[in-house]
Amino acid sequence: MGKKSKSQKEAPATESAGSLPFLGGNVSVDPSLASLFEQSAGPVKVPEVPRLGAAPKTKITDVEKDEEESSSAGNDSASEDQFMEDAPESPDAAEEAVQAVPEPPSRKRKRAAGEDLEESYMRRLAKEEQKEQKKRRAERSSSLEEESEDGEKESPQSEDGESEDEGADIPKHEALAGAANDDDELSKSNRTVFLGNVSTKAITSKSAKKELMKHLSSFLSTLPESTGPHKIDSIRFRSTAFASGGKIPKRAAFAKQEIHDDTTPSTNAYAVYSTAQAAKKAPAALNGTVVLDRHLRVDNVAHPAKVDHKRCVFVGNLDFIDNETGTEEGEKKKKNRPPADVEEGLWRTFNAHTKASQSGPAGRGNVESVRVVRDRSTRVGKGFAYVQFYDQNCVEEALLLNDKRFPPLLPRKLRVVRAKKVAKKSVETTGAPKGSDRTLQGRAGKLLGRSSEARLKAAAKKSISQSSLVFEGNRATADGSSRIRVRTKSRGSKAKKDSRSKKRAAAYKAAGGKKAKIGK
């Protein structure tokens, strides 16, 4: 069976060789055609796309090659060739393969390379802050150059190129500032003057305010220029009657110019000059002058004029409101009459009827000041006032105006009497007050407020031992001896000679230790 099967297998082979003539050994082969099949390109390689995070494959180092050769010494050469063909020949080939694969399109908004919104926004803020700092430095340097009298230059810049103001004050709360704010207010009060009977037109009209400011600075040209530039720094209005009646803040009513002229057409103001000398000269130069059709009362805030009751008169039965046009229910409507003006009426009336002695400044009359007492919040008058003259003799002429009317400014009958002296409470002090302390008595509360007034009073009550150390000693002498005499106890020299105890002791000894009567 074996031989038969072998012969059967060899038979088809010979048949196939006979059927294909080019497989026979005797057939000639074309060398050009055979050369095409000698070399083979091998199987088709599928390009591998490496991951983005993975590093490209590099050539195997010599150490790795030695390890692989030692471990795979018995492997076939075909497997080694296959391993080397799988690895990329160079990193450039891997990069080309990555670039060849197209990336899927992104749906995100296209931005420029390296664009970061947060960083750009922060850079913009930093640039704006630098511009503001440069602007502040320029303004600060210009103000320092204008105000500096000695011509001192601005402090040199630091290494970083930023100028540092060492003298800049750190802002503090007013409660922590304490005495520093008090000193500033006191220095400011020396440059401030009080203005009374100012027309309310200065609040509502810019031209009227400009006229008032021009009048207040009219005397500044007479002051010496060596003492500094004299001008008005600021002016503020106080004690103004507003139409709101206290329902809205005073600042809001002032901004809206809701002035209630029916109560009173006058107000008070405070003008701050640039120098203390200008503030001292202002009362003598401006008091009693007429501006905006009203007599102006000017007084120094730091050193007000003395109130002398011997030169004052008390005026009663005055109008509470200047324009009393309103009527109650059931009353007949009064005839239309011009509105009264209490404060200006007192100035004009008493100046016109006191011509006996012209003791005041030329052309200003004899009235020094008029003080109408009003409510603090509503500015409604309380029906009385005080008029002070320059000369005491004017009081006698003013008393003749009792029970008289002077319409339209003073439509009611006046009650004119001598002013009485008001006894003031004495300030409790440990010793005689100094001149500097007397200047603040009675004015500390008005200038600095209640808290600062209490602080000053507490400081005045302190003894010397609480405020400072006291060193006591002796005054030096030429011979170096001390002038202080110390009394020492002397037993024999200053003892009494014929004393009663001495006589009793002598009698006791003479009696032999027994009691005996002492001879007289």
From Swiss-Prot:
RNA-binding as UniProt keyword: yes
Gene3D superfamilies per UniProt: 3.30.70.330
UniProt cross-references to Pfam families, sorted A to Z: RRM_1
Region of interest (Disordered), residue spans: 1-29, 41-185, 472-520
InterPro entries found in the cross-reference section: Nucleotide-bd_a/b_plait_sf (IPR012677), RBD_domain_sf (IPR035979), RRM_dom (IPR000504)
GO process annotations (BP): maturation of LSU-rRNA from tricistronic rRNA transcript (SSU-rRNA, 5.8S rRNA, LSU-rRNA)
Matching SUPFAM superfamilies: RNA-binding domain, RBD (SSF54928)
Molecular-function GO terms, alphabetical: RNA binding
GO cellular component term, pick one: nucleolus
Cellular localisation: Nucleus, Nucleolus
Keyword field contains RNA-binding: yes
Comp. bias regions, Basic residues: 484-520
Function text: Involved in pre-25S rRNA processing.
Family label: Belongs to the RRM RBM34 family.
Protein name per Swiss-Prot or TrEMBL: Nucleolar protein 12
Organism: Emericella nidulans (strain FGSC A4 / ATCC 38163 / CBS 112.46 / NRRL 194 / M139)
Name of the gene: nop12
